[in-house]
């Protein structure tokens, strides 16, 4: 595909007219956006732009350097006659210069300047450190100057020793013959003086170079010492690598260099290394050997791979390293550990940079036996982190939910209808009041006359549209009422004028206050003769609901759901509260809402009642609700009529989710299925991990208590609950779990919405459970399977009946209670001792009746001495089954002979009594 002006402008992120102007300025004539551009045109344009911006480098290569390396081996014999192989590397370098530049010979003829290695970047240091370094450098300079002076004095003394004796030995001779000799000696002396001056100058230059090297080395060492402890690479390593690439830049080794390296000067009681001593201690052994090394350090030096002197030598080297190497003091590292909701022991140890054994040891000290793969909950993990001295932060790492809720913030906010929840005690007339407003007959269709679902309706009134949520009033539906208060803007509190404030009325008040929702009180049933509105007002004030007529802000409207009295005033007050709240929501945005209710329909699949809170929900949208997701296949309003979209504050029934969502879950429209699936799977895994971690924590906490108290095995009543909607299933499960006591417990094996299927029956067979169908029925296959396997299925449509039946079943599982009843009193008149039998008591039955099977207590001075059973009971010589009051008898006690005259026997019987919850 040919490149056009338009395509190039798009790649350069510029407009086509601007690019045409630049091409014209570069001398390239292009008439329109569709003209093609060649690579040559691009190069010309690039050079023009570089010149226009002041760049001298046109990007073209002017010089190419080719380096060729050749390696070979030569064999060389030493003085002992042994041959060794030396590797020789020859480097050939060729420079290719672009036409118009200097020739390679001219370039080669120029002297090569020695490029000084770049100084390592110095870290930022404080003024105190600068002063210390300056003092150290001054001291080093003084020591070197003193050393230089001493060497100079020694040289002068040596010169005097050489020259003075020669002068003394010369004999006096005649001037004429001596003149040529004197001239020669003078020339020789001048030459020697020049040589001496040159050598002194050379020595001084050498001393200066060594002093500079020593100062640089000292500065480098101090920089290394003051550098942070975790520096991985010394700054001087770059220069060292450059130095290793060639050998031409190294100076020739001077004579006596080894002596200079070993020499040290003592000044002030301190030993100072020679200035040529390198700070790289591992190369010291290599320098001492003086031989050619082709494979690194093989001389047995500190870093060598040959042992050199055996284990003793290695031990000495290791001890030398310990004594000379600088050890940075280690401080405890305090880490910020982000702890998610669940984390394994291994992950927690990795986050703290410790071994897993340390964490397991600490947990064992806290009474928890765990493995490295054990999942810990967030609270336990944070305690472990703090115990080990780190900082723990509760976090939700890698949570895709964090990306949600960012769409639609810039949309225009428009007024929306208020969402009004009707709350109150059971049978106070909430649904009847809504029926009167909607002119419908919902309450008549409710089983038992009570509401067991959340009903969502929107009503068109002359003053505007209102969305109503009708919540159950029975105590079992606390969670439903909490969800209703969460989704609402205004709460209508219905109180019966003849009944007053009841427990669920108080609970509704608490829900409204906790949610910060304004209240409107409707006193219902004012048409009844026993209605007492004043008593209701006083009870409401006692519950911190101050009415307007008492100086508060809560409207108070007497209404009658039967006659319709006060309905208009109630709606007017509701709309007035809505105007004060200024309720607004974006309409042209992805929908967000709340699951009010959910159920599993056999033909439609998962069905959810959703209240749209913002945006517009359309048919075909990808929806995410908790851990379930799916595309909206169908939408229906509260009357069962299909609809294509729903705006803010509109309740709709949707189909198409992957599973039944939990009631109260947030609903949001997602851009695509991939994102929705990712978040749903993440939530499923997180819910499972959190649940398992909490179960494990409870098991670990109760393990020692169970061992200490002794395991009391409770009887279990396994149940499988199938309900029509999520809210009813949730309420029934919670209510049945509350029936559990230590002796008998309710075990809910499975709870779900929908009809009873063969899967449920098979699960009941395995777990020996009873199936409770609440407003749901079993299909034909499930009924047949249940009959064949003896599975008990109970159907209920009123929550009271289900609870009562389970309570009765639990009562039947209780161990019967024992009741003791005193049936008679016997007085011992005489005691007979009979061999082989024991003591026989002659008695008189004072009160009641004595039976042969009765249990007795022996009383002595009204104190119980013994409790047991009768061994025999006789009347004269005959055995008797029972003896009544006023009759004498003889009896013996089983296993007890310590009977005395005057003792009494208390006769009693123990009977079993059925217990109930």
UniProtKB/Swiss-Prot annotation:
Compositional bias (Basic and acidic residues): 252-262
InterPro entries named among the record's database cross-references: DNA-bd_dom_put_sf (IPR009061), EF-G-like_DII (IPR053905), EFTu-like_2 (IPR004161), IF2_assoc_dom_bac (IPR013575), IF2_II (IPR044145), IF2_N (IPR006847), P-loop_NTPase (IPR027417), Small_GTP-bd (IPR005225)
Pfam family, one: GTP_EFTU
Record-linked SUPFAM superfamilies: Initiation factor IF2/eIF5b, domain 3 (SSF52156), P-loop containing nucleoside triphosphate hydrolases (SSF52540), Putative DNA-binding domain (SSF46955), Translation proteins (SSF50447)
G1: annotated span: 424-431
Disordered as annotated region, ranges: 241-312
GO MF annotation list: GTP binding; GTPase activity; guanosine tetraphosphate binding; translation initiation factor activity
Region (G5): 560-562
Subcellular location: Cytoplasm
GO cellular component: cytosol
Positions of region (G3): 470-473
KW Lipid metabolism (keyword) present: no
Occurrences of domain tr-type G (ranges): 415-582
Function: One of the essential components for the initiation of protein synthesis. Protects formylmethionyl-tRNA from spontaneous hydrolysis and promotes its binding to the 30S ribosomal subunits. Also involved in the hydrolysis of GTP during the formation of the 70S ribosomal complex.
Protein name: Translation initiation factor IF-2
Upper taxonomic lineage: Bacteria, Pseudomonadati, Pseudomonadota, Betaproteobacteria, Burkholderiales
